[in-house]
């Protein structure tokens, strides 16, 4: 078993950031021992912090990244590299993209370096049965070993599953659950844990809003449920909350409101899988809980290998639009 002696966190972060400006997809040189040590150290930190995080604004919230490492670097260029800004990521760091290892290693490294300012929630892809199939297992096996993939699984099984920002914004990867009556139920989930096929933890990572549903509906994914605007309104009212912030679905503009701006979906992987023309969105929450959005535009098809640097994003919706403030009414 590795120990933390194998881990020089500053040196690792430096190497991970050195590929900025290089051709997208350039692999970062890392050793299996240091990645293993990174997993062990970050796992310790996850277990030392609550499974339901209680965070304070200001912070920036990001949705799915899915191994699109170059786009993760673009997000940080735009929002500020830690510790310049505080961050909450909503899960789905691995699978589908070409550089899941660089992506998860940079995120875990920032967690170790800035444990009180940088937060990661669990997505449905931070689960062995899913990332065994959709790319992460194959990437670990090809570049290092199956054993390393298992070490990541042990780390992912300890990630927090939801966050409350100033007791007003509820954040999770997927959505609500018919089993969720009070926040204490989330706090009672014991870690390490796999993601079960049904129940509260499954729903928080897998469910989706559906404007055409009242109450709860079947989910086309074959897992969990869909929930209607009435469920959102009821949940916010019961818990004295203002907004649900979640990820889990590709949305064209990088962010999309639902249920009269009571729920927002964030998706932070532009040109997802190279198959969509979606933008990537990041939500900034200021001290007054005003929410605004920073957008990474999808890259032009013809500029496939052109580095997309500081000017690749454009600010979206100015802060003053009605319904974008949570909390301070």
UniProtKB/Swiss-Prot annotation:
E.C. number(s) listed in UniProt: 3.1.3.16
Keywords: Cell cycle, Cell division, Chromatin regulator, Hydrolase, Manganese, Meiosis, Metal-binding, Mitosis, Protein phosphatase
Stored InterPro entries: Calcineurin-like_PHP_ApaH (IPR004843), Metallo-depent_PP-like (IPR029052), PP1_catalytic_subunit (IPR050341), Ser/Thr-sp_prot-phosphatase (IPR006186), STPPase_N (IPR031675)
GO cellular component: cytoplasm; nucleus
Active site annotation, chain numbering: 125
Listed cofactors: Mn(2+)
Top class in the EC scheme: hydrolase
Note accompanying the cofactor annotation: Binds 2 manganese ions per subunit.
Binding positions (Mn(2+) 1): 64, 66, 92
Record: residues binding Mn(2+) 2: 64, 92, 124, 173, 248
Residue numbers spanned by region Disordered: 309-329
Catalytic activity: O-phospho-L-seryl-[protein] + H2O = L-seryl-[protein] + phosphate; O-phospho-L-threonyl-[protein] + H2O = L-threonyl-[protein] + phosphate
Record flagged with keyword Hydrolase: yes
GO biological process, one term: chromatin organization
Residue pairs linked by disulfide bridges in the UniProt entry: none
GO molecular function, one term: protein serine/threonine phosphatase activity
Subunit structure: Interacts with lab-1; the interaction is direct. Interacts with knl-1; the interaction is direct.
Family: Belongs to the PPP phosphatase family. PP-1 subfamily.
Function, as annotated: Serine/threonine-protein phosphatase which antagonizes the function of air-2 in the regulation of chromosome cohesion. Dephosphorylates histone H3 at 'Ser-10'. Dephosphorylates translation initiation factor eIF2alpha. Involved in the activation of chloride channel clh-3 during cell swelling and meiotic maturation.
UniProt protein name: Serine/threonine-protein phosphatase PP1-alpha
Source organism: Caenorhabditis elegans
Gene coding for it: gsp-1
């Amino acid at each position: 078993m590795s120990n933390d002696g194998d881990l020089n966190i500053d040196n690792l972060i430096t190497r991970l950031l050195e590929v900025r400006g290089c051709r997208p997809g350039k692999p970062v040189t890392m050793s299996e021992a240091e990645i293993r040590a990174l997993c062990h150290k970050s796992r310790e930190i996850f277990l030392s912090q609550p499974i339901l995080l209680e965070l304070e604004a200001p912070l920036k919230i990001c949705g799915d990244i899915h191994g699109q490492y170059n786009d993760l670097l673009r997000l940080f260029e735009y929002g500020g590299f830690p510790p310049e800004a505080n961050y909450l990521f909503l899960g789905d760091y691995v699978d589908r993209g070409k550089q899941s290892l660089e992506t998860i290693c940079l995120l875990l490294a920032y967690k170790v370096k800035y444990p009180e300012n940088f937060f990661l929630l669990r997505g449905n892809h931070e689960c062995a049965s899913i990332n065994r199939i959709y790319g992460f297992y194959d990437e670990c096996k090809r570049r290092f070993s199956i054993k390393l993939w298992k070490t990541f699984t042990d780390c992912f099984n300890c990630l927090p599953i939801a966050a409350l920002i100033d007791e007003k914004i509820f954040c999770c990867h997927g959505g609500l659950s018919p089993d969720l009556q009070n926040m204490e139920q989330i706090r009672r989930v014991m870690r390490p844990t796999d993601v079960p096929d049904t129940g509260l933890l499954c729903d928080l990572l897998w469910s989706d809003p559906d404007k055409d549903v009242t109450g709860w509906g079947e989910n086309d994914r074959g897992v969990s449920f869909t929930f209607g605007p009435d469920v959102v309104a009821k949940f916010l009212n019961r818990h004295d909350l203002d907004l649900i912030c979640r990820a889990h679905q590709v949305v064209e503009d990088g962010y999309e409101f639902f249920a009269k701006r009571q729920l927002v979906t964030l998706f932070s992987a532009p040109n997802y899988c190279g198959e969509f023309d979606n933008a990537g969105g990041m939500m900034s929450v200021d001290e007054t809980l005003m929410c605004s959005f920073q957008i990474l535009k999808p890259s032009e098809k013809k500029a496939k290998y052109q580095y997309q640097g500081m000017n690749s994003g454009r600010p979206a919706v100015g802060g003053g639009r009605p319904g974008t403030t949570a909390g301070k009414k």
